[in-house]
């Protein structure tokens, strides 16, 4: 196999033109930086956890690019292209990583609070009555889905229009991705018992791919567009 990339928590190898192998490490990544300490068997845990959720989603009819687990800390996945020049992405582009992080928020916390204070987001945008003073930890009346960039050095918040233009998505495709995110969260709720306890910031994120038949996603995944045009997801480790 050919080693093609070193990430913060995994090594990436090319198996063949259509297949990659992820080798999960015991590294710890905090605020996009690797710290000196390691956690024994963390890589194995990440790999097994990803396989577990991909298996559940596959049974639910949600496509993903998991192929196999050749060892306890390695995963083989279908390869997709990463296109950094967004001007080359349109509705006809296939087999590429959709350059968006799709974030589903359930509580007022983290950066959402900062944007509420600055007026960039209003209470009514979140389903509250106009003028309501949102407090830290308030449960949102409805899940709030938004997108940030995925391939930039730092995540940047995007409007719906900006996200669709950057990723080459139609209105229908964009809504389908959001619906899939909510479906996955409902599956997590069923399996884990509490869909809204994933992080201290009250959010769950999903990055996507487009190939051609369908899209899908997983918790902390990347979206891709497949050959038939619809989105699905790919794994992300932290």
For the regions a protein language model found, what residue spans apply to each?
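Short acidic loop-to-beta-strand element that houses the catalytic metal-binding Asp/Glu
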Residues: 10-11, 203-205
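Catalytic activation segment of kinase domains across protein kinase-like and atypical kinase folds
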Residues: 204-238
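A long amphipathic alpha-helix within ATP-dependent nucleotide-binding catalytic cores
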Residues: 169-200
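Active-site loop/lid in soluble adenylation, ligation, and acyl-transfer enzymes
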Residues: 1-148
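A structural signal for short, well-ordered beta-strand segments and their strand-loop junctions
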Residues: 103, 199-203, 216
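A short mid-domain helix/strand-loop element embedded in enzyme catalytic domains
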Residues: 138-170
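Coil-to-beta-strand transition motifs
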Residues: 19, 196-199, 211-214
